[in-house]
Amino acid sequence: MWSTRSPNSTAWPLSLEPDPGMASASTTMHTTTIAEPDPGMSGWPDGRMETSTPTIMDIVVIAGVIAAVAIVLVSLLFVMLRYMYRHKGTYHTNEAKGTEFAESADAALQGDPALQDAGDSSRKEYFI
């Protein structure tokens, strides 16, 4: 039933001692010895086990995953670069033309034609 394999493929039985509080009963233990390694594995004299070589299907699956990740990364790079260059320089300010030569900010804004009222000049708005 339960066995432990040693490096040289012999089996040792595990000790199953009965519980001291239980009545004694006869227990039969089966041990098995395995003379050869498991199928699909080839044993080495020093106790190492060599795994089987990967199949073609394993290689195809791994290559597909790597290709999908590469395509996603290239797509993201393309989208990021396109977005960066498309929006480069689109920040516009609405400053009045010729304000760099004015003596003060008020004088520059008084001469700006975009800020002149076409109608009533008696109404003024003050910002505090």
Curated annotation (Swiss-Prot):
Extracellular topological domain ranges are 1-57
**Which tissues does the record link to its expression?**
Glycophorin-C is expressed in erythrocytes. Glycophorin-D and IsoGPC are ubiquitously expressed.
Q: Where are the annotated glycans?
A: 3-4, 6, 8-10, 15, 24, 26-28, 31-33, 42
Describe the effect of residue 8 to S.
Webb (WB) antigen
Which segments cross the bilayer?
Answer: 58-81
Cysteine pairs forming cystine bridges in this chain are: none
Please verify whether the record's keywords include Glycoprotein: yes
Which intervals carry biased composition (Low complexity)? 22-33
Q: What ranges are annotated Cytoplasmic (topological domains)?
A: 82-128
Provide the protein's localization: Cell membrane
Positions modified as Phosphoserine?
104, 122
Q: Where is this region: Disordered?
A: 1-48, 108-128
Q: Where is this site: Not glycosylated?
A: 8
- Its membrane topology, per UniProt? Single-pass type III membrane protein
What are the alphabetically sorted keywords of the record? Blood group antigen, Cell membrane, Glycoprotein, Membrane, Phosphoprotein, Sialic acid, Transmembrane, Transmembrane helix
Listed GO CC annotations? cortical cytoskeleton; membrane; plasma membrane
Q: What is its main location?
A: membrane
Iron as a keyword? no
Q: Where is the composition biased (Polar residues)?
A: 1-12
UniProt xrefs under InterPro entries? Glycophorin, Glycophorin-C, Neurexin-like
> What does its PTM field state?
O-glycosylated with core 1 or possibly core 8 glycans.
State the function annotated in the UniProt record: This protein is a minor sialoglycoprotein in human erythrocyte membranes. The blood group Gerbich antigens and receptors for Plasmodium falciparum merozoites are most likely located within the extracellular domain. Glycophorin-C plays an important role in regulating the stability of red cells.
The similarity annotation says: Belongs to the glycophorin-C family.
- This protein is called what? Glycophorin-C
Q: Which gene encodes it?
A: GYPC
